[in-house]
Amino acid sequence: APFDFDVSVKDIYSSIMTGAQLVLIPKEYFSTPPRLLDYLCDKKVTNLTWAVSALTLVSALKGLNYRVPESVKRVMFSGEAMPAKQLRIWQEKLPEAKFVNLYGPTEITCNCTYFPIERQYEDSEKIPAGKAFPGRRVILVDEEGKQVTEPGVQGEICSAGESLANGCLL
């Protein structure tokens, strides 16, 4: 992620905390999937933490038919809803990789929920946002601000915890 975007925090500090090497991908590589995939393979990248739009661009343009970055063991994505069709393409090309859906609204630094993907989804299915990370809390509230607890009832997602920006209240 660009350094002026909060998601870069996750990219930078996760590599420092785990002792992994952070590979910076030149922005222009994302417009040419073969060049991007060659780069991932050459650098032996093991973890992708990308926006959904970057993953879907590669799969929709059939980049994975050109070359599969087989060193990738984990794919985490956020920023928008992942289309099940595009996720299945990645899952089929990287069957041993773990896939994780991440969610976090603007007022959260990075993400507040995660959902490990353990199966393939049909096009008509929505991939769940998952459960709250430790130190965070996520609830659904109705139009009156009351917590929604019944399955299938719509509401607004509200979050609280250590990643919430100052001045934002649940």
Regions found by a protein language model. Give the residues of each.
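Conserved AMP-binding/adenylation subdomain of ANL enzymes
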Residues: 2, 6-46, 119
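Short gly/Ser/Thr-rich phosphate-binding loop of adenylate-forming enzymes
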Residues: 30-35, 52-66, 74-97, 135, ...
